[in-house]
């Protein structure tokens, strides 16, 4: 044996086999899927461009009221005060995730864990 490779399959045979497979399956096209990580990177770019708040306002407001209830009952909040708390909370979380990502990169990891 001279180590020669097996002869390549002819393109015509390949195309004929593909059309036969489509005919067998009834021509149903499977939905398009992006490679793992592509959508994640697109979302990262999208959210880094945006400036709007990412936590829904009402659930955050309920959380603020629930926490405040432990210290004093019947507290009232100006809407701007709740928005200021939300801005601060989201800014803190963004900074935390940035630091977490730097730590993950330093440890030669890709995924961050809680």
Curated annotation (Swiss-Prot):
Molecular-function GO terms, alphabetical: DNA binding; protein heterodimerization activity; structural constituent of chromatin
Gene3D superfamilies: Histone, subunit A
Keywords of the record: Chromosome, DNA-binding, Nucleosome core, Nucleus
Region annotated Disordered, chain positions: 1-31
One Pfam family matching this protein: Histone
CDD domains listed in its UniProt record: HFD_H3
Annotated InterPro entries: Histone-fold, Histone_H2A/H2B/H3, Histone_H3/CENP-A
Disulfide bonds: none
Subcellular localization(s) per the UniProt record: Nucleus; Chromosome
GO cellular component: nucleosome; nucleus
Task performed by this protein: Core component of nucleosome. Nucleosomes wrap and compact DNA into chromatin, limiting DNA accessibility to the cellular machineries which require DNA as a template. Histones thereby play a central role in transcription regulation, DNA repair, DNA replication and chromosomal stability. DNA accessibility is regulated via a complex set of post-translational modifications of histones, also called histone code, and nucleosome remodeling.
Family (UniProt): Belongs to the histone H3 family.
Quaternary structure and partners: The nucleosome is a histone octamer containing two molecules each of H2A, H2B, H3 and H4 assembled in one H3-H4 heterotetramer and two H2A-H2B heterodimers. The octamer wraps approximately 147 bp of DNA.
Name this protein carries in UniProt: Histone H3-1
Source organism per UniProt: Stylonychia lemnae (Ciliate)
Upper taxonomic lineage: Eukaryota, Sar, Alveolata, Ciliophora, Intramacronucleata
């Amino acid at each position: 044996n001279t180590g020669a490779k097996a002869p390549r399959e002819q393109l015509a045979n390949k195309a004929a086999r593909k059309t036969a497979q489509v005919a067998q399956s009834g021509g149903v096209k499977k939905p398009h899927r992006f490679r793992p990580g592509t959508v994640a990177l697109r979302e990262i770019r999208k959210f880094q461009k945006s400036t709007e708040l990412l936590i829904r306002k009402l659930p955050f407001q309920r959380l603020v009221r629930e926490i405040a209830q432990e210290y004093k009952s019947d507290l009232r909040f100006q809407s701007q005060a709740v928005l200021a708390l939300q801005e601060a909370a989201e800014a803190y979380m963004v900074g935390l995730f940035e630091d977490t990502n730097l730590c993950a990169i330093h440890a030669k990891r890709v995924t961050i864990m809680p």
